[in-house]
From Swiss-Prot:
Keywords: Metal-binding, NADP, Oxidoreductase, Potassium. GO terms for cellular component: cytosol; GMP reductase complex. Gene3D superfamilies: Aldolase class I. It comes from Buchnera aphidicola subsp. Baizongia pistaciae (strain Bp). Its EC number is 1.7.1.7. The keyword NADP applies. This is GMP reductase. SMART domains: IMPDH.
Length: 351
């Protein structure tokens, strides 16, 4: 047993200090990024946000909506091959290039992955997604996928420490997904005591990844657009969103009415609800590590995205960053004991 004495930080523990700026308008800020990936050597340009590969968020409809903004969607792994075939043959290539194909690490997952990727050469992203990216089995599977697809951009995770980020990049990952337990419907930290405050994880993991020419995704923990700005300020190359995109018409959660209001079911992918739906229940040796909640139905996702992008542009303006890439260099975090004045938070007038 050992104890690390330094305090690790989450998004709620900091604010970004404003700095002098010569920007005259938020409209001058460019949020697009251009990446050339370490192993695949492919280029990608767009706004580096990603809809999470949760079955209510990472949907085909979400991919179509977000592609118009130049934003990625990690399509969840529960669509069938026939679902994929129908989808790929009915959408333009501009949508396909903003899609990640998600997979687990079972043998049948690999077979299905190969079938899906055979549908279009424009499918460039693979997202190998497991809850615990620290297992040797996961690293072995990553190497197997890289050997088979030398030209694909591979994202792998989840981990939260620099040494494992390095291991995954050296084993074939172009991008490493960072985050254990920060998600809005994740209970891993409560159930297992395992985790790492997200901002510190991003800062440490981005340092490790960038030293090897890789990138990271900050996955989880964002509640407002300011949290996304903090993730980018801390060194994240991409930010993945689940709860912030839940409840929209492009999602596939169950919709119901309660007290004359419309709600949508949203749940973690390790929740009992998800396991009952996809694998026939919770195995006797497991415990659910996610919760099921109701969120207000919010209509089209486009308005939410515009609000997020507006917040990011404003952050950049406050610190004098003309581009999103500059934000990390312009960021100085200050540790705080408060974030905002919440006195009227429950008394807002609906538009």
């Amino acid at each position: 047993m050992r104890i690390e004495e330094d305090i690790k930080l989450g998004f709620k523990d900091v604010l970004i200090r404003p700095k002098r700026s010569i920007l005259k308008s938020r409209s001058q800020v460019d949020l697009t990024r251009l990446f050339i990936f370490k192993h695949a050597q492919n280029k990608w340009s767009g706004i580096p946000l990603i809809a999470a590969n949760m079955d209510t968020v990472g949907t085909f409809k979400m991919a179509i909506a977000l592609s118009s903004f130049g934003i990625l969607t990690a399509i969840h792994k529960y669509y069938s091959y026939l679902d994929w075939k129908k989808f790929i043959h009915t959408i333009p290539g501009t949508v396909v290039k903003h899609i990640m194909v998600s997979t687990g690490m079972l043998d049948e997952d690999f077979v299905k992955l190969k079938q899906i990727l055979s549908l279009s050469s424009k499918l460039k992203y693979i997202c190998i997604d497991v809850a615990n990216g620290y297992s040797e089995k996961f690293v072995t599977f990553l190497k197997k996928v890289r050997e088979c697809y030398c030209d694909k951009i591979i994202c792998a995770g989840n981990v939260v420490t620099g040494e494992m980020v390095e291991e995954l990049i050296l084993s074939g990952a172009d991008i490493v997904k960072v985050g254990i337990g920060p998600g809005s419907v994740c209970t891993t930290r409560a159930k297992t005591a395992i985790g790492y405050p997200q901002l510190s994880a991003v800062i440490e993991c981005s340092d490790a990844a960038h030293g090897l020419g890789g990138q990271i995704i900050s996955d989880g923990g964002c509640v407002v657009s300011g949290d996304i700005a903090k993730a980018f300020g801390g060194g994240a190359d991409f930010v993945m969103l689940g709860g912030m995109l839940a409840g929209h018409k492009e999602c596939e959660g169950l919709i119901f009415k309660e007290n004359k209001k419309r709600y949508m079911i949203f749940y973690g992918m390790s929740s009992k609800f998800a396991m009952d739906r996809h694998i026939g229940g919770v195995a006797r040796y497991k415990t659910p590590e996610g919760k099921t909640v109701k969120v207000l139905f919010r209509g089209a996702v486009s308005e939410t995205i515009n609000n997020i992008l507006g917040g990011l542009r404003s952050t950049c303006t406050y610190v004098g960053a003309f581009t999103l890439k500059e934000l990390t260099k312009r960021t100085t975090f200050i540790k705080v004991s408060e974030q905002e004045n919440i006195i009227f938070n429950n008394q807002e007038v609906s538009n």
